[in-house]
Amino acid sequence: MSAAIVAPTPVSALVHSSTLVTAGVYLLVRFRVAFEGSDMQITLLLLFSLTIFMAGLGANFEYDLKKIIALSTLSQLGVIMRILSIGYANLGFFHLLSHALFKALLFICAGAVIHNIKDYQDIRVIGSLVSQIPLTTFCINLAKFGFMRESFLAGFYSKDLVLEIAFIRNIFLFFFILVCYRVNSVLYFLFSILYF
């Protein structure tokens, strides 16, 4: 993942929104029969839940614009894999599609912002973008609201279904708390992009 962060922003958009995430999800969808109903399913559930937690925590303390977006990709990958580990391949695919759409838009807009401010990626340096690039700022906000479960955007429906399935399936309280943390922690680091 660190090589994809250093790459030019269109390459990062391609790798993080489709290639990297889709390859892992596709492999688990194809091999999900191997771990359904076994002890390996609980191990994968724990592994993916810890991935969600650590990537979300790392993104909260980062100031590099592309690293924040990349760590949120890793966290979303954990959410998708967690959905697959409890047996909902169609929901995982739907969440993958909504994630890819908003993540690609966010990376392309981040590339436009970085280009506009002379290759600075530190969000503490970026400021008053609304007056400089209003259309790009609008697209960034649209992508952020898609990730933050704003009503009537695809992220709202996919993340709401994730929470509903986690609640209905009566999974362990620890895993349910981690899912709620992940779905709501995206608010913090996306608001940090908006704030700075």
Q: What spans do the regions from the language model cover?
A:
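Hydrophobic transmembrane alpha-helices and their helix-loop junctions in integral membrane proteins
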Residues: 2-196
